[in-house]
Amino acid sequence: MSAVAEAPLPIQMTDAAANKVKTLITEEENPELKLRVYITGGGCSGFQYGFTFDEKINEGDTVVEKSGVTMVIDPMSLQYLVGGSVDYTEGLEGSRFTVTNPNATTTCGCGSSFSI
């Protein structure tokens, strides 16, 4: 008998984020959609978080599954997101996906850009 140890996920997705993704996928009527989280250059702090839906998992993507939904991250973005968590919040600023990123040394006031 052999036991397979699961490696800890390099990035987490909260229940709130998973539930919102599930709702959005249901509204789109496309069960193939996955939440793609990525990093782009820009913003007041140098890097910005991006979120989009994608039907494909590309070679090298990291896949995180939670509550029946899939989040994918490309290798270049993952290096900036390791140890982080994707959440969904609703508040006075509106509703949005957010990233808690332990690698970020500074963030802007709105939380959508960061530097390392």
Curated annotation (Swiss-Prot):
Iron-sulfur cluster binds at residues 44, 108, 110. GO terms for biological process: iron-sulfur cluster assembly. Binds 1 iron-sulfur cluster per subunit. Pfam families: Fe-S_biosyn. Its cofactor is iron-sulfur cluster. Keywords: Iron, Iron-sulfur, Metal-binding. GO terms for molecular function: 2 iron, 2 sulfur cluster binding; 4 iron, 4 sulfur cluster binding; iron ion binding. GO terms for cellular component: cytosol. InterPro entries: FeS_biogenesis, FeS_cluster_insertion, FeS_cluster_insertion_CS, FeS_cluster_insertion_RrpA, HesB-like_dom_sf. Required for insertion of 4Fe-4S clusters for at least IspG. Homodimer. Belongs to the HesB/IscA family. NCBIfam families: iron-sulfur cluster assembly accessory protein, PRK13623.1. This is Iron-sulfur cluster insertion protein ErpA. The lineage of its organism: Bacteria, Pseudomonadati, Pseudomonadota, Gammaproteobacteria, Aeromonadales. The gene is erpA.
